Amino acid sequence: MPRVKGGTVTRRRRKKVLKLAKGYFGAKHALYRVANQQVMKSLMYAYRDRRQRKRDFRKLWIARINAAARMHGLSYSRFMHGLKLAGVEVNRKMLADLAVNDQAAFAQLADLAKANLNK
C-alpha cells in the first residue's frame, strides 16, 4: 500500500485557523503556531464571555432599577418586594427599560410597590 501524505488535509486545517485569526496583530495573524494558540484562547474567551454577558446585563438592569427606585424613595430590594406582593410579574429587563424610557409608568409601579409594602 502506498504512503499517503497529509498535505492537503494539513493545509486545509491551517488555512481554517489562519482565516479565524484574520485581523489579529503581528505574527498572530500570519504564523500558524502563534495564530493557533491565539485562536484557541479567543474561543475560550468567547465561550466565557457569552456567559458573562448575561451576568453583566443583569447587573446593569439592577443598577438602573435601583437608581430609579431611589428617586421614588425606595431601595431596590424594597421596590422588588413591593412589586412581588402586588403580583406584578415584570422582569428586570422591562423594568430597567421603563426606568430609562418611560418614567411615568415606572413612577406608577413605584407607587404600587409602596402601597403594597404598607399593607
UniProtKB/Swiss-Prot annotation:
Transmembrane segments: none annotated. Keywords: Ribonucleoprotein, Ribosomal protein, RNA-binding, rRNA-binding. One of its GO terms (molecular function) is structural constituent of ribosome. The keyword Ribonucleoprotein applies. GO terms for biological process: ribosomal large subunit assembly; translation. One of its GO terms (cellular component) is ribosome. Binds directly to 23S ribosomal RNA and is necessary for the in vitro assembly process of the 50S ribosomal subunit. It is not involved in the protein synthesizing functions of that subunit. Belongs to the bacterial ribosomal protein bL20 family. This is Large ribosomal subunit protein bL20.
